[in-house]
């Protein structure tokens, strides 16, 4: 295995045994690919903006004299980059410019003669851009558009499973769902008539739609029924016999032919009888006349002589009609073939309840149903029916829909057509009737072949199309009005509706969500989330159990573990590790192909539909060296069922053991030993871990930590290989390798790092370099760690030394006892950054002002403000301190213009303003780390704003100059190389000024050309630098574009350091969560024989009932890993030679039968030293999901570390020094601190705001509310008999308005007594009873 430069620094020992056939694909591709498809110009016009434009344009005027055509579009450059957008609170977007062509036709000349053509580029609003990490910056905040799982367009056959009708009869239905347009439903009623509904409106007999398509009764019967022919011969009836049709019938007469009786009357016809009849070639049999009575005629029979109809099509034949027929000379009769078994008379029955007779009456009936109350005309009815399913503007099945539709009804042609046609409708009805007849199956709507993913690009395109359609109407009207000679395309198009539609989608759609930015994992999983909710999806209330449940087709596509607990369970899913979307939007998962019993490394991606017919072996099937299966019988899946199959039958095999689960679940080591419910909690809680001050890699991981850290985008990753030229806290410079250079560039890559910025969840984002100057790096190497990453690996928590034992009741019911050492070492200290904003507005009474001159505020309160009234950076502030001084005019009266003038001349009166300063919220204290001032264009900047501006300009200049110098240095080094090659001596060059080198000349023409090219590049570089600086300067100095009425915004950033404390929530990765009950002194904690105290004591009773045994194995393996680290430390102390270390490390990495082969001999001495340095804290271990370290390997590793193989140690009580009587399980567990901190939840109220109606205190910390004293609490006080306490709880402490004021007065007067009055909620109750019409009054006791 080849390790990258960063990986070599700390090689993770891998216990996985299955070879890695496929790397985990880029985790954010579902977002990025989809959006690229939307924005990329697609010559076919299938996807994205191009498709939206082509579907709406050209727009023709109503009179047909002109049309507006679409030519092409282009996206401009964004004004601000991502960081600037976040600071300024604007949307990161590109302007969309569309080239349109207005064609005006000559009215007087023949049709199609062009009179005038005008082309122009029109601005059509802004299109938000996706950042490199798959997010959008909307109004300054990072948002994610979650993909939606919705029902695929197509046709679905379903049944009500006998729930609708009381008899329990199963009613079948078919539904045609288009991508856009009206739904078409066919359904049976309990009487077996077939009905149709359009858009879920009232139902009509299904034959109406066929009549509206122009079919007569005869044609309809012809489509749906087989016929039986009868012949009248000398007073007897001969029936044409198709023996197969008799199957299952009871003979109502002797079936005989040529005197031979085949079936006696009253007997049932069996397969044997049919074979006999077929063998003897019987094709006609004689039937009694009564047999035909009650059969249904298949066409009209007319008396040729009189022209009257004897029998109508679809009319039952009676004896009388039979006599009339033979009288009129009809010798042959054709009737419909029906039976109760598999040829029901459904369509014939339906025609009888259909009141319409011809096409027009059917169209009118449909019109009445769709538009009740409007008088129907023939034209309107025809136009409506045409527009419902047959017009491309109104109806589109989409490519997916057509593909699903055709495969469902078995149609081969009409691949591209988006609308329905006659064949489609008839075929759907035929299939539905066939299903009712017992042939065919209903569809499973929860099958992933019937649900598809709608990603960002597709949703944005749909919204964009909605905007265009709104514009289309306006354009049509403008084209039809008056004179077009002076009109340009720009005058026709109003970009407002388009940008409004796009803005609404990105800003407030249910699927556009505020990004979960707790840690890198929560970012990645948020982007990989698949939601069944949202517009066009399900709603929480209506979603039943089936939709939420795990379906067999989820295997390898959606994770069965990771889903939220609560009302959304099963509706919000996560993409599995290897899953991807195909071109139709269906989820696919990869499988290894098995050819002639040999498993190959070729990988095929199969969708849920394709997977059905294959036998797929599991990833843990044992293989021989040559790739054949080792066992005769293997566990495999076919059609979603798991079972044992002979090895010859296998056609595919899973690619990896973690193929089934999502990224978050793949991060749980020993997941295979955890109960699913706990694994779900574990996966969800990792997303809530807060990044700690010093990230600490997990000792026991699963090997995909690196993928998450790198793909999440929080680390700085090398774009190209090279050598590190310089490193400081905020930037890394890489000199690029020669072979990766683009000809004619300076060959320097500069990575600017993010320092101490605020995330969406107020956690701290900070990048730290993890490379040193002179180190070689390759493309994809990690250069800097972000939050929660350590040497390029995800590190959500800390490795803690843990003991499973009770300790004085402090770990009762999942409480956690923590050692004081954890606090001292800042193991779980986190930094939180809050943004507080102060806005100065223009009010009716005059403008608000930001100033240090605040009325009635003492000197000490202003000590942290500068003269502009804004807090200093670095100031330590606590609750209630002023951050930004602001005064607002308060006027009893609005001023007249004259008064305003006098005020302006003679200055303000101090009493006319009130203090509205921005203060630190009550429960917060911390350090000011940054201040930003935004001033409206045209408003004078204050001193602080100018200082900040100067500082930003200085920094920008410094950054750009350094960048320029680095690039210039690279360029001049290449100039020097050329000059030396051309004969100049190095000493002479060093003596000359470097800028003059470019003016020197060379004899060699080729070298002179090279030199001139380099000189040109230098000029370009200089010009580029000047241009960049000018742009930057303009951005910094120009006024800001603020909301209407806002003059100035001051943003203050406050950093809070939170140490761990009782009440904080912590958890492991196995769903083992708890709250800290006590921080115990180190000397009281249990310690082992070496005197090493444990950090955390957990309750052993938290394990058995929860069945998450994975945590115990993790603890054992963690102990061994740490033991190896201790052993290396010991060797370092003894100063053993490097060879010994190499030998020991080789032994460690070779342990167990694993796929990983680490050759320590191939590492250089320096690399081994780095490795030793990084392993001293413990050997990092990977135990992949479902392929983890076996018990034997754990024991072997413990042995290697000289630790007891039981994983248990004798512990001593820290308080008494006595040994505990039993050995205790001690080891290292990876613990997370979750974002449920006691500081954010702790809250107390004295007095505050009250609810308007009930006059009771509000609830919740945000409203500064009170604690609810509910029903059960009242019972408790009743049980104690504490009557007075109860009385004050229900009156003066709650909603007795007069009592509250009296009590306040009494307290002020020093009189500590109370007089309870009437609670306001009692008055509310009285009023509510009165509203029911019952008068109820309180009478005083006199």
Curated annotation (Swiss-Prot):
InterPro entries: DNA-dir_RNA_pol_bsu_ext_1_sf, DNA-dir_RNA_pol_bsu_external_1, DNA-dir_RNA_pol_su2, DNA-dir_RNAP_su2_dom, DNA-dir_RNAP_su2_hyb_sf, RNA_pol_bsu_bac, RNA_pol_bsu_CS, RNA_pol_bsu_protrusion
Reactions accelerated catalytically: RNA(n) + a ribonucleoside 5'-triphosphate = RNA(n+1) + diphosphate
E.C. numbers: 2.7.7.6
GO molecular function, one term: DNA-directed RNA polymerase activity
Annotated TM spans: none
HAMAP family associated with the record: RNApol_bact_RpoB
Protein name: DNA-directed RNA polymerase subunit beta
Organism this protein belongs to: Vibrio parahaemolyticus serotype O3:K6 (strain RIMD 2210633)
């Amino acid at each position: 295995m080849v390790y990258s430069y960063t990986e070599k620094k700390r090689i993770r020992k891998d216990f996985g045994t299955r070879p890695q056939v496929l790397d985990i694909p880029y985790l954010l591709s579902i977002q990025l690919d989809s959006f690229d498809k939307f924005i990329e110009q697609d010559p076919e016009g299938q996807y994205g903006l191009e498709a939206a434009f082509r579907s709406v344009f050209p727009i023709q005027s109503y009179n047909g004299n002109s049309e507006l055509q679409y030519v092409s579009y282009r996206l401009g450059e964004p004004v601000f980059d991502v960081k600037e957008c976040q600071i300024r609170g604007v949307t990161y977007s590109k302007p969309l410019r569309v080239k349109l062509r207005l064609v005006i036709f000559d009215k007087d000349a023949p049709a199609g003669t062009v009179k005038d053509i005008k082309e122009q580029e029109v601005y059509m609003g802004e299109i938000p851009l996706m950042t490199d990490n798959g997010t959008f910056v909307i109004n300054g905040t990072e948002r994610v558009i979650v993909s939606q799982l919705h029902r695929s367009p197509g046709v679905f056959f379903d049944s009500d499973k006998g729930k609708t009708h009381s008899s329990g009869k199963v009613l079948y239905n078919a539904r045609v769902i288009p991508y856009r347009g009206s739904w078409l439903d066919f359904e049976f009623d309990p009487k077996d008539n077939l009905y149709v509904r359009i858009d879920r409106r009232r139902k009509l007999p299904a034959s109406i739609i066929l009549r509206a398509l122009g079919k007569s009764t005869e044609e309809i019967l012809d489509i749906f029924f087989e016929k039986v022919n009868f012949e009248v011969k000398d007073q007897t009836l001969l029936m044409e016999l198709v023996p197969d049709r008799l199957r299952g019938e009871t003979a109502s007469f002797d079936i005989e032919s040529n005197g031979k009786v085949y079936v006696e009357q009253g007997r049932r016809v069996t397969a044997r009888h049919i074979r006999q009849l077929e063998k003897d070639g019987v094709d006609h049999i004689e039937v009694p006349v009564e047999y035909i009575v009650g059969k249904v005629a298949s066409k009209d029979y007319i008396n040729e002589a009189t022209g009257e109809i004897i029998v109508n099509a679809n009319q039952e034949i009676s004896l009388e009609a039979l006599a009339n027929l033979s009288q009129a000379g009809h010798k042959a009769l054709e009737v419909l073939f029906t039976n109760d078994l598999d040829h029901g008379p459904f369509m014939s029955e339906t025609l009888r309840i259909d009141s319409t007779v011809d096409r027009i009456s059917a169209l009118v009936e449909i019109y009445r149903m769709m538009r009740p109350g409007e008088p129907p005309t023939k034209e309107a009815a025809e136009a409506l029916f045409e527009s419902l399913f047959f017009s491309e503007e109104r109806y589109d099945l989409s490519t997916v829909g057509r593909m699903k539709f055709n495969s469902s009804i078995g149609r081969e042609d009409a691949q591209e057509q988006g609308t329905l046609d006659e064949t489609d409708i008839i075929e759907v009805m035929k299939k539905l009737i066939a299903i009712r007849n017992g042939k065919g199956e209903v569809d499973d709507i929860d099958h992933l072949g019937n649900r598809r993913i709608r990603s960002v690009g597709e949703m944005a395109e749909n919204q964009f199309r909605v905007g265009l359609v709104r514009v289309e109407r306006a354009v049509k009207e403008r084209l039809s009005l008056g004179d077009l000679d002076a009109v340009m395309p720009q005058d026709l198009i109003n970009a407002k509706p388009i940008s409004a539609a796009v803005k609404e989608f990105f800003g407030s759609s249910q699927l556009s969500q505020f990004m979960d930015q707790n840690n890198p994992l929560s970012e990645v999983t948020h982007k990989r989330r698949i939601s069944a909710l949202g517009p066009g999806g399900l709603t929480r209330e209506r979603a039943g159990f089936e939709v939420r449940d795990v379906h067999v087709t989820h295997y390898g596509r959606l994770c069965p573990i990771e889903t939220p607990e609560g009302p959304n369970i099963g509706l919000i899913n996560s993409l599995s590790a290897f899953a991807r979307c195909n071109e139709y939007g269906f989820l696919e998962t990869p499988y290894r192909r098995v050819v002639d019993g040999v498993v190959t490394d070729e990988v095929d991606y199969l969708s849920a539909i394709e997977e059905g017919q294959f036998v797929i072996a599991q990833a843990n099937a044992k293989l021989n060296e040559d790739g054949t299966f080792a066992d005769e019988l293997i566990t495999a899946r076919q059609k979603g069922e798991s079972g044992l199959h002979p090895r010859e039958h296998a056609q595919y095999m899973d690619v990896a053991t973690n193929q089934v689960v999502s990224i978050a679940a793949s991060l749980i080591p020993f997941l295979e030993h955890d109960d699913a419910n706990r694994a779900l909690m574990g996966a969800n809680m990792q997303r809530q871990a807060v990044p700690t001050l010093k990230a600490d890699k997990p000792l026991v991981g699963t090997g995909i930590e690196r993928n998450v850290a790198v793909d999440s985008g929080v680390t700085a990753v090398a774009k190209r290989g090279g050598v590190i030229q310089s490193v400081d806290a905020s930037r890394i410079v890489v000199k690029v390798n020669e072979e990766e250079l683009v000809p004619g560039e300076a060959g320097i890559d500069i990575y600017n790092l993010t320092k101490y910025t605020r995330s969406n969840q107020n956690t701290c984002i900070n990048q730290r370099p993890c490379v040193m100057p002179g180190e070689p790096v390759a493309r994809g190497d990690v250069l800097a760690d972000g939050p929660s990453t350590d040497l390029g690996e995800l590190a959500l928590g800390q490795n803690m030394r843990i003991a499973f034992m009770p300790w004085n009741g402090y770990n009762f019911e999942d409480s956690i006892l923590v050692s004081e050492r954890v606090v001292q070492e800042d193991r779980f200290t986190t930094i939180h950054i809050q943004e507080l904003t102060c806005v100065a507005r223009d009010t009716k009474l005059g403008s608000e002002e930001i100033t240090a001159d605040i009325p009635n505020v003492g000197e000490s309160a202003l000590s942290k403000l500068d003269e502009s009234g804004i807090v200093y950076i670095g100031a330590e502030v606590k609750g209630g301190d002023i951050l930004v001084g602001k005064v607002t005019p308060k006027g009893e009266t609005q001023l007249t213009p004259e008064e305003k003038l006098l005020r302006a001349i003679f200055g303000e009166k101090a009493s006319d303003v009130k203090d509205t300063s921005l203060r630190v919220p009550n429960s917060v204290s911390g350090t000011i780390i940054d201040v930003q001032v935004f001033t409206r264009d045209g408003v004078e900047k204050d001193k602080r704003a100018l200082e900040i501006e100067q500082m930003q300009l200085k920094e920008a200049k410094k950054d750009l100059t350094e960048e320029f110098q680095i690039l210039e240095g690279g360029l001049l080094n290449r100039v020097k190389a050329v000059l030396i090659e051309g004969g100049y001596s190095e000493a002479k060059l060093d003596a000359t000024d470097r800028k003059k080198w470019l003016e020197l000349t060379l004899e060699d023409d080729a070298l002179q050309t090279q030199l001139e090219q380099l000189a040109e590049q230098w000029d370009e570089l200089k010009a580029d630098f000047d241009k960049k600086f000018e742009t930057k300067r303009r951005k910094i100095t120009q006024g800001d574009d603020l909301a209407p009425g806002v003059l100035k915004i001051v943003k203050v950033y406050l950093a809070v350091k939170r140490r761990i404390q009782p009440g904080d929530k912590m958890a492991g990765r196995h769903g083992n969560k708890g709250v800290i009950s006590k921080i115990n002194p180190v000397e009281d904690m249990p310690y082992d024989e070496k005197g090493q105290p444990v950090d955390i004591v957990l309750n052993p009773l938290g394990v058995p009932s929860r069945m998450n045994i994975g945590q115990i194995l993790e603890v054992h393996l963690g102990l061994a890993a740490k033991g190896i680290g201790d052993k290396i430390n010991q060797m370092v102390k003894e100063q053993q030679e490097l060879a010994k270390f190499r030998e020991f490390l080789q032994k460690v990495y070779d342990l167990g039968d694993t796929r990983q082969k680490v050759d320590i001999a191939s590492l250089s001495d320096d690399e081994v030293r780095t490795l030793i340095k990084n392993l001293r804290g413990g050997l990092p271990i990977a135990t992949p999901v479902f392929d983890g370290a076996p018990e034997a390997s754990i024991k072997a590793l413990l042995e290697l570390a000289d630790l007891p193989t039981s994983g248990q140690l004798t512990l001593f009580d820290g308080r008494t020094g006595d040994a505990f009587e039993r050995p205790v399980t001690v080891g290292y567990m990876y613990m997370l601190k979750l974002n449920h901190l006691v500081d954010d939840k702790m809250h107390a109220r004295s007095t505050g705001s009250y609810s308007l109606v009930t006059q009771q205190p509000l609830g919740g910390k945000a409203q500064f509310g009170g604690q609810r004293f509910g029903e059960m609490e009242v019972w408790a006080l009743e049980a104690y008999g504490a009557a007075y306490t109860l009385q004050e709880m229900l009156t003066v402490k709650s909603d007795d308005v007069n009592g509250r004021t009296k009590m306040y007065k009494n307290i002020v007067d020093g009189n500590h007594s109370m007089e309870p009055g009437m609670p306001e909620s009692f008055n509310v109750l009285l009023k509510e009873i009165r509203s029911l019409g019952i008068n109820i009054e309180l009478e005083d006791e006199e």
